[in-house]
Structure formats: structure tokens, C-alpha cells
Amino acid sequence: MTTRAARGEVVPPRADWPEPAPQTEAGALLTEVVLTTFRLNARVLDAAQQLAAAGGLTAAWWQVLGGVLDQPRTVAEVSRRMGVSRQGVLRIADLLVERGLAEYRTNPAHRRAQLLACTEAGYWAIRQIAVVTHPWTDRIGEQVGAADLRSLLATMQRLVKVLETADGQENSAL
């Protein structure tokens, strides 16, 4: 029986598999960080879904609406800030507008790219979420500790910056 891999190619016998280069300590640690981030992401998304329900939103709606709380932005700007696809943000933005949680405004800087802005109903939904989110983040934050969270945040921001500047350079994934 022939075994096929995820991309559809035939899986060769194990004896013919390529050997990966040995990892440095930093590379092995980064691998563990990535795998742990997958686990953390799943837990955070589960919690976000429950928290967002307090405002009548989904986690994805909360994420997109959160991208325009401080100022109106284009869908492309929101997608870049959130690190998600433009098409996904557009689909959710249209739903938010349809439900009155956001609105499209004329963009003086670009005729075709409208600005997405939060409405009073959107701000109200976010306030309802904040009422349940703050006690949750306080409780979890106290268990981890402010100093550790500050250090973690700085490291995560640095890693994001390294990965974002890696596009087209030797740091890119492929």
C-alpha cells in the first residue's frame, strides 16, 4: 500500500528520509516556544470566545473591532495590525457593519479604501466584554506575576519584530 503525505506526494521508506541539520540551543528553544505558543493560543482563543460572548461578539469580531477602537482604519490596515488575512477581516467587518457595531466612512486619503470605524453599539459591546475580562486577566496575571509578564511581553514583541522583518531575508521560513 502506498502512503501519501499531506501534500499528496508518496512517502518514501524511512531509510530514504533526509536528516535535518542539528539544532542550536536557541533553535531548539524557539521550537519549544512555537509549540507552547500553539497550546497557549488554543487556550486564549477558548477564553476569548467565552469573554466575547458577554458583549454579544465572537472572538474574531472582538479582534477586528479592537483594531479600530482608537481610530478608524482601512480593512488592510486592520489585517496588518492583527496579522490576519485581509479577506477574513473584510468578511467580519461587513458583518460588524451589518449589525451596527461598526460603520464604513469615506477615506480622505484613498477614494476606494473606506475606513472602518467603531459605532456606539460597538463601544458598548467592548465595554461589556471589559467588565468580565478585567477580573479574568487580573486573576491570571496575578498568578504569573507582573515582572514575568513584562519580560514575556518584551520577548514576544522582539520575536514578532524579528519574524516581521524576516520576509524576503534569510530568516524567512522557506
Explain the meaning of each model-derived region.
Residues 1-25, 147-174:
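C-terminal regulatory/oligomerization modules of transcriptional regulators
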Residues 1-55:
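N-terminal leader segment of winged-helix/HTH proteins
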Residues 4, 94-154:
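Charged, amphipathic alpha-helical coiled-coil/dimerization segments
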Residues 30-52, 126-144, 149-163, 167:
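Hydrophobic alpha-helical core bundles mediating ligand binding, dimerization, or RNAP-core interactions
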Residues 44-88, 99, 171-174:
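N-terminal helix-turn-helix DNA-binding core of bacterial DNA-binding proteins
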Residues 67-70, 76-79, 94, 148, ...:
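A general secondary-structure boundary signal
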